[in-house]
Amino acid sequence: MAKYIKTGVSYINLDNARTINILPEDIDSYLELGGDEAYKTSDLGSELYINYADFESTNILFDLKKEELQAKIDAFLISNDTVLDLSEVFLDIHFSEDDDYEEDCCCEDECCSDEENEACCNSEVKVEEECCGGAKDDCCGGHEHEHEVCCDSETKTSETQEECCGGTKDDCCGGHEHEHHHHHSHQH
C-alpha cells in the first residue's frame, strides 16, 4: 500500500524508500533559514532523511522535536493510513544533489546524473557545444548565467547564440562581467 507524507502542496512517496532516518535539525540549516539570529537548542526542529532505491534522497525539515517526529512516522508506518499530513509543521525540503544541480545544468535534464556528462555539468569545465543547444535553457538554465543576449529568449537567434557561446566558457556560462551587444561582426 502506497504511503505518502504531505508537506503543504506536495506529497512525498515512501514506496521506494530504502531507509528513513530522523535526525535533529542541522544547525547550518537553522542558520540558513533563520539568519544569524541567536538560537537555543530547544528551537531546533528535526530532519527526515529518506533514501530511495535509486540512491536519490529527500531531506525534509519539520518544526517538531526528533522524538515527536519519530513517534508520528513510526505510528504512520504501521497504521493503515495512506497519508500523514505534516503540512503544519513543515519548514523546508531539499532533494539530493543531482536534483539541485539540474537547475544549473547546461544540458538536458538527465545530464547531471550521467557520469559521462560530467564535463558539461561541472561548472569549471562547461562545454559550449553541449551547453549551447537550441533552447535558451540549454545555455542559460543556471542562476549564474546572466547574459541578456544569450538568455533572453526573445533575442536568442543563431546569431546571438554564436555571440553568447564564443570561444571561452565565460562567454556562455560564466562571467557577469561579459555583456555582449549586437554590434559584433559575425563570420559564417
Curated annotation (Swiss-Prot):
Domain of life (superkingdom): Bacteria
Protein name: Uncharacterized protein UU101
Organism the protein comes from: Ureaplasma parvum serovar 3 (strain ATCC 700970)
